[in-house]
Amino acid sequence: MAGARGLLCLWLGCFCLNLAQGQRPNLHLPGLRGTESSDRMTGGGPSPDLRPHDKVSEHMLWLYDRYSGSNRAQATRTPGSQLPGPQPLRGGNTVRSFRAAAAGTLQRKGLHTFNLTSLTKSENILSATLYFYIGELVNTSVNCPESQGCSHDSQRQHIQIDLSAWTLQSNQSQLLGHLSVDTAKPYRDSMSWLSKDITQLLRKAKQDEEFLIGFNITSRAHELPKRMLLFPEPYILVYANDAAICEPESVVSSLQRHRDFTAGTVPRLDSHVREALSVERRKKRSTGILLPLQNNELPGAEYQYKEAGVWEERKPYKSLQTQPPEKSRSKKKQRKGPHQKGQTLQFDEQTLKKARRKQWIEPRNCARRYLKVDFADIGWSEWIISPKSFDAYYCSGACQFPMPKSLKPSNHATIQSIVRAVGVVSGIPEPCCVPEKMSSLSILFFDENKNVVLKVYPNMTVDSCACR
């Protein structure tokens, strides 16, 4: 017993001495070594079994947040994920995404096919990038034994990825070009998306009107896993400058043509992407209702209601009635055309007083006035992802002589107002209240092939008004 007690005291003394010298006893606990090796292999990132989300929609939403001034990019990005950094538009106004179709077979090679028919003749390709996922290849690396003490820099794979591009036709296929990518990256899931510039390939394909192309992804020294070729799909981002976007009614020609979308055919975004979009849509909506004033005066300020049921609760009109014809009316009034409306809205006294009060407050001169456009009201909400509505504003008001400097009249508008006021020449109208400065609007939508597109449309929001 005394001998055992002495050995115990000796062991405790050595243990305390090691702690004092900064050394740690080597305690082999079961299960920790396997976890440590796994973390070293993956770089502490997510498990390789975790499949990334819909990167195409997520990447396009990131670009929309960037070019529309939104602050939701961090909310959209999922924890532990990292989007490939986009390149600037460089003077362009369009970003198109193309999702790869199911892998096919061409000369016994797996292909990722892309349908580029959405590219228009007016769109000049500035740059194009192919994004593809190799996370499963990177994370299935050779495990570094703990006994060798491998450093972090040595845990790298230098694998050459070969990309062969093909133009696909009905009866034959033609090689478009070869590219290579070096995957000299650490073992982290955040680095498992690779990208390659394919600008010249797509320019050549567009010039030759070859809009169906395929990419074959192979490795020289390693066999790519079959699962990589199936999910997640590669995608292409094309940055372009649309020369026709400044033409009259360009926003209508590029957006209204998607009316062939039927219910249920519009693609659905990933759940976390839809949640990020819903942050903006949950903002309180205000509806401007212009009251009929039964004269030719300028419309008053709009009514804005915070709740949907306020208008019905207040009951500003009594009923929709048909006015009986008066017997004392002259035949001339009775012979008015059938286009004349026989129904008028009967407003209560409280509503009319409020309308008159707002008319008095409303500036009579040329000014910018509020207008909110909801794409659902014009039937475009099915294919427009964001924004669902925007503040367009409009210009209205008088440009009468003498015009103050605040109306910023042009020299021609000043002379025109003087001639009209003097009355030397009859029939001269007063200058018009028109937009002076306007700003662009970024719109994210689905094209006819159900690919996500970002376009920056100019002159969509009125910033200031002037007399011209």
Curated annotation (Swiss-Prot):
Basic residues bias locations: 329-339
Subunit structure: Homodimer; disulfide-linked.
Main function: Negatively regulates bone density. Antagonizes the ability of certain osteogenic BMPs to induce osteoprogenitor differentiation and ossification.
Listed InterPro entries: BMP3/BMP3B (IPR017197), Cystine-knot_cytokine (IPR029034), TGF-b_C (IPR001839), TGF-beta-rel (IPR015615), TGFb_CS (IPR017948)
Pfam families: TGF_beta (PF00019)
Protein name: Bone morphogenetic protein 3
Native species: Rattus norvegicus (Rat)
Gene behind this protein: Bmp3
Family classification: Belongs to the TGF-beta family.
